């Protein structure tokens, strides 16, 4: 008997007119991982500048050797 009286006390009431609100909890959304470059853009620029400078020095040394050998 106690169960039937408790059920009657907690009767569900749904409105026939008006707004019905529901509570939603945020769910984490998994995104695709972002691929990071192995080297930064500035590091690549520095490496290319260094390579170009080394090549320029080698060219100058070769030109000096050729001119020194001719004289």
From Swiss-Prot:
Biological processes per GO annotation? cilium assembly; receptor localization to non-motile cilium
GO cellular component, as recorded: BBSome; cytoplasm
Record flagged with keyword Glycoprotein: no
Q: Which InterPro entries match?
A: BBIP10
**Cytoplasm keyword on record:** yes
Q: Which Pfam families match?
A: BBIP10 (PF14777)
Q: Which residues form a coiled coil?
A: none
- Where does this polypeptide localize? Cell projection, Cilium; Cytoplasm
Question: Superkingdom, according to UniProt?
Answer: Eukaryota
* Keywords annotated in UniProt: Cell projection, Cilium, Cytoplasm
Q: What does this protein do?
A: Required for primary cilia assembly.
What's this protein's family per the entry? Belongs to the BBIP10 family.
Know the name of this protein?
Answer: BBSome-interacting protein 1
């Amino acid at each position: 008997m106690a169960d039937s009286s408790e059920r009657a006390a907690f009767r569900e009431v749904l409105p026939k007119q008006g707004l019905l609100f529901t509570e939603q909890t945020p769910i984490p959304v998994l995104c695709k991982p972002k691929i990071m470059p192995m080297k930064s853009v500035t590091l690549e620029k520095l490496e290319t500048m260094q390579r170009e400078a080394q090549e320029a020095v080698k060219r100058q040394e070769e030109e000096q050797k050729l001119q020194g050998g001719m004289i």
